[in-house]
Amino acid sequence: MAFRPLHDRILVRRVESEEKTKGGIIIPDTAKEKPQEGEVLAVGPGARGEQGQIQPLDVKVGDRILFGKWSGTEIKIDGEDLLIMKESDVMGIIEARAAEKIAA
């Protein structure tokens, strides 16, 4: 991939959700909502502060994040559907321990 976000933008790949509910019901593609969880693939250098200095971003490449349903702009890079969004669209970073509990 040859894409580098600018300023406070980040590049995100959606993380697909389970195809079955906990009760074993299979969810058809037509009933699925787009996931609001993703993995950060690239980050910009940061936003400029009032004094002109660059404020580094809190998110890093590899972070698993939650974002709003309508956040970001959908793009296609190398045939893969990705999102570009501002860091302010991110609601939070999923910590490793929390992600393990969700998966279990």
Swiss-Prot record:
Lineage: Bacteria, Pseudomonadati, Pseudomonadota, Alphaproteobacteria, Hyphomicrobiales
Similarity comment: Belongs to the GroES chaperonin family.
InterPro entries given in the database record: Chaperonin_GroES (IPR020818), Chaperonin_GroES_sf (IPR037124), Chaprnonin_Cpn10_CS (IPR018369), GroES-like_sf (IPR011032)
HAMAP family in UniProt: CH10 (MF_00580)
Subunit structure: Heptamer of 7 subunits arranged in a ring. Interacts with the chaperonin GroEL.
Name of the protein in its database record: Co-chaperonin GroES 5
Role: Together with the chaperonin GroEL, plays an essential role in assisting protein folding. The GroEL-GroES system forms a nano-cage that allows encapsulation of the non-native substrate proteins and provides a physical environment optimized to promote and accelerate protein folding. GroES binds to the apical surface of the GroEL ring, thereby capping the opening of the GroEL channel.
Record localization: Cytoplasm
Gene3D superfamilies associated with the record: GroES chaperonin
GO MF terms, alphabetically ordered: ATP binding; metal ion binding; protein folding chaperone; protein-folding chaperone binding; unfolded protein binding
Any single GO BP term: chaperone cofactor-dependent protein refolding
Keyword vocabulary terms for this entry: Chaperone, Cytoplasm, Plasmid, Stress response
Pfam families attached to this UniProt entry: Cpn10 (PF00166)
Protein's UniProt keywords contain Nucleotide-binding: no
